[in-house]
Amino acid sequence: MLVLGIESSCDETGLALYDTQRGLLAHALHSQIAMHREYGGVVPELASRDHIRRALPLLEEVMAQSGTRRDDIDAIAFTQGPGLAGALLVGASIANALALAWNKPTVGIHHLEGHLLSPLLVDQPPPFPFVALLVSGGHTQLMRVTDVGVYETLGETLDDAAGEAFDKTAKLIGLGYPGGPEVSKLAETGTPGAVVLPRPMLHSGDLDFSFSGLKTAVLTQMKKFEAAKLEGEALERAKADLARGFVDAAVDVLVAKSLAALKKTKLKRLVVAGGVGANRQLRAALSAAAAKRGFDVHYPDLALCTDNGAMIALAGALRLGRWPEQANADYAFTVKPRWDLASLAR
């Protein structure tokens, strides 16, 4: 089965072709970072308009890369939610228009299910079951994954997502957009232990997260720097130490909760997905913990940590392979800006 995947939930337009026999044939991605940078965040209307401009050229690109003709495609998968309503509507409209013109069925995909399954795109994918740590700008969750569509929420953030905390911390420190990669980069130059921040809910006894207090702690430190009238090199060094303290605190919590989830479920495999999953400090800490405690940890390729069409094409192929009745051939569709991943459980 050959599936075309279309991702447009936020500020990346991604298209890809996935074949159940040959794997990922081609994927192309356009990021809107440069367009949104001057606003310090994603502007939904601009995001939607850019998806309209970019989708068809990206389609031509993946078709040419893979030597695929429209007659070769068996189905079209698109991100149905969650995400920005206008952005989702663009991708859904394009998917269903192509499907109508080409006489193909469609299937709507949960954006987070795409992330959750993205590590299956590697050469040696992890077998089911496993624990999944989903860490992105909008979500932080621990899930027990028994099979495709068989998900149990073990824990989730009670306020800010981890990626949101990274972005807000970067803004407080005075870094550019997008903040997550910038604060991570700055943290690598900071001194470990120079600034020690709280580890929210580290000993809560459950698998939930909270990052709003960590963000507040960063703000408090910045006010201390201001009161001390730090400037120049001293201020830059203090900011680097603060970034290091923030990243260390966030990573400690993510690792500790992941270990607790593995212990609770008695599973030996952890899958990490979502944009924050590209963070080098997090990967290093989880890999070290895996080596020490004897479990396997799996990540998607770095290029597939961000939103992309490949994960949507894969999820579509897996769903249609298991549940052919999910194919939609009447081209009526809805989008779901808010959509609980656990609601997909079968």
From Swiss-Prot:
InterPro entries, A to Z: ATPase_NBD (IPR043129), Gcp-like_dom (IPR000905), KAE1/TsaD (IPR017861), TsaD (IPR022450)
Keyword annotations: Acyltransferase, Cytoplasm, Iron, Metal-binding, Transferase, tRNA processing
Binding, Fe cation: 111, 115, 307
Signal sequence coordinates: none
SUPFAM superfamilies from the UniProt entry: Actin-like ATPase domain
GO cellular component, one term: cytoplasm
Keyword check for Transferase: yes
Binding locations of substrate: 134-138, 167, 180, 279
UniProt family annotation: Belongs to the KAE1 / TsaD family.
Protein name: tRNA N6-adenosine threonylcarbamoyltransferase
Organism of provenance: Burkholderia lata (strain ATCC 17760 / DSM 23089 / LMG 22485 / NCIMB 9086 / R18194 / 383)
Taxonomic path: Bacteria, Pseudomonadati, Pseudomonadota, Betaproteobacteria, Burkholderiales
Gene field: tsaD
